[in-house]
Amino acid sequence: MRRWGTTERVVGLHDPQVNEHHLESTGLPADNRLRLLSFNIQVGNSTEKYRHYITRGWQHLLPHNGRAGNLQKIGDLLSDFDLVALQEADGGSIRSGYINQVEHLAHLGAFPYWYQQLNRNLGRLAQHSNGVLSRLKPTAIEDHPLPGPKGRGAILVRFGEGPEALVVVMMHLALGGRTRNLQLAYVRDLIGKYKNQVLMGDMNTHAN
């Protein structure tokens, strides 16, 4: 039996992927405000009601005709933002038609910089990923596997140098409260030395 994703993930420092066709889109808008969005795209599925998790659950495993249209709508929405965190994107497998959805949305939204974090590698069956899309060139991108069962990750994106730099952590946390607290403690340690911090993503919990 073939085993996927058995390689141990470690913290990694990466450069962003560059979308050469949209380098003219770099920089902040005229009002100098950074527009942020976090979006769990559910592999491009359309989930409107709780029952759809059952009736449309097969769409998380297999390709379907509506996915391309859903991604186009998402891409149109993303074009209004400067920095986007994506959760539940597929990095290119049978269910997504072998399309890297992070890269695809970077093209649709005209983002010059993007990065895909692969958290669960199931080969051709699924490439469970987080992603970041940015109009500003990151100074550094850190890829962090989170504590707890394998398959959860955080991306730390840094703009600038030293303690005055802006750090943005994009994450998809666990369902269980105990593991989620461990993951948040890990993130807290990551950002402690920075003055300007933004946390965004799918926390799988409600704000208190």
Give the residues covered by each predicted segment.
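Active-site catalytic loop in hydrolytic enzyme cores
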Residues: 135-165
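Active-site metal-binding loops of divalent metal-dependent hydrolases
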Residues: 39-41, 89, 171-173, 202-203
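Active-site neighborhood of phospho(di)ester-bond hydrolases with catalytic His/Asp-centered motifs
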Residues: 85-87, 115-118, 198-202
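Metal-dependent phosphoesterases centered on the DNase I-like endonuclease/exonuclease/phosphatase
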Residues: 177-208
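N-terminal, active-site-proximal structural segment of metallo-dependent hydrolase catalytic domains
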Residues: 1-108, 121-122
